[in-house]
Amino acid sequence: MTVRPIVIHGDPVLHNPTQLVTEDVSELQELIADMYETMDVANGVGLAANQIGVSKRIFVYDCPDDEGVMHKGCFINPVLETSEIPETMPADDGSDEEGCLSVPGEGFPTGRAHWAKVTGLNEKGEEVSVEAEGFLARCFQHEVGHLDGFLYTDVLIGRWKRMAKKAIKANGWTEPGLTWMPGEDEDPFGHDA
């Protein structure tokens, strides 16, 4: 397993839809293992393949639900269903706060559906379907968004969208080729402090 650099906002691999996986899952095992390792070292709860520069429709997760129970898995060619996404401003009390390894160190309230269901293949090539509510549902929506070519900053509204644009510009995340290396660079979210 190898920790790979995480691509930062501004790179085209993050802003374009990923490609459907057509190869046999046996050919993906090294990539999937690297994704898990990178996510773990980065202290993330999810990681999409394009976040490490690979334009394939795959994501991994190791995320708690609202009761603190951890859920770990991999989806290949995931299909997402959700309940209605609220059109109101997200809560400003921290409950809707979202961050992203590709927007390092930033976090903004993001409106998401409370319920989500993801269907696809796991790393063994078996068809799986997982339903989730709350934080785990948020994780699924976030990761599938990556695979569709969107970052969470693209779905922000109101002042949060304006603040995100300012942060992206201030950090110089408007051009391709920027990365950070989990385990080597300082943790942008302060987990190693």
From Swiss-Prot:
Catalytic activity entry: N-terminal N-formyl-L-methionyl-[peptide] + H2O = N-terminal L-methionyl-[peptide] + formate
Keyword Lipoprotein on entry: no
Catalytic residues, chain numbering: 143
GO biological processes: co-translational protein modification; translation
EC assignment: 3.5.1.88
The protein's enzyme class: hydrolase
Cofactor note: Binds 1 Fe(2+) ion.
Alphabetic keyword roster: Hydrolase, Iron, Metal-binding, Protein biosynthesis
Keyword Iron included in the entry's annotation: yes
UniProt: Fe cation binding residues: 100, 142, 146
Cofactor(s) required, per the database record: Fe(2+)
Superkingdom: Bacteria
Gene Ontology molecular functions: metal ion binding; peptide deformylase activity
Similarity annotation: Belongs to the polypeptide deformylase family.
Function description: Removes the formyl group from the N-terminal Met of newly synthesized proteins. Requires at least a dipeptide for an efficient rate of reaction. N-terminal L-methionine is a prerequisite for activity but the enzyme has broad specificity at other positions.
Listed HAMAP family: Pep_deformylase
Protein name: Peptide deformylase 2
